[in-house]
Amino acid sequence: MLSPKKTKYRKFHRGRLKGHATKGSALAFGRYGIQALTSSWITSRQIESVRRVIVRHLKRGGKLWIRIFPDKAVTAKPLETRMGSGKGSPEHWIAVVKSGHILFEIDGVSLELAKEAVKLAIYKLPIKCKFLSNDEFAKD
């Protein structure tokens, strides 16, 4: 699973999910992609699950780019612990995704195979997503 090697701070504020993505909202590497339609947190486990589904479906045929990285730690207190006594310890890593952000990109496969792989991958994500294709290449 993905996680940063080193961070400036151990614990982060939760923050708010406002607005749409301005950067990372266009295809940059591949012909096809998965675009988020809603904003949410995506865990490193969910990213790994989607990666495995896509790679297995492409069967060594294409290339996959992961455009998001879980760089924010989410803390949690142990079960049955009284309130107070500080913030909990880092539990897992998340990527903050805003609507319009490209999550994954695929290249080197046909349009049909890419659509099938993306359809399977979207089931693994906790947000609404859509299939995106670069129009200049999608006329095969």
Swiss-Prot record:
What's the main place this protein lives?
A: plastid
For the keyword Plastid, the answer is: yes
- GO cellular component term of the entry, any: chloroplast
Q: Which Gene3D superfamilies does the record associate with it?
A: Ribosomal protein L10e/L16
Which cysteines does the record link by disulfide bonds?
Answer: none
Single GO term (MF): rRNA binding
Assembly with partners or alone: Part of the 50S ribosomal subunit.
Q: Which family does it belong to?
A: Belongs to the universal ribosomal protein uL16 family.
Q: What is this protein called?
A: Large ribosomal subunit protein uL16c
Give the organism the record lists: Cyanidium caldarium (Red alga)
User: What gene does the UniProt entry assign to this protein?
Assistant: rpl16
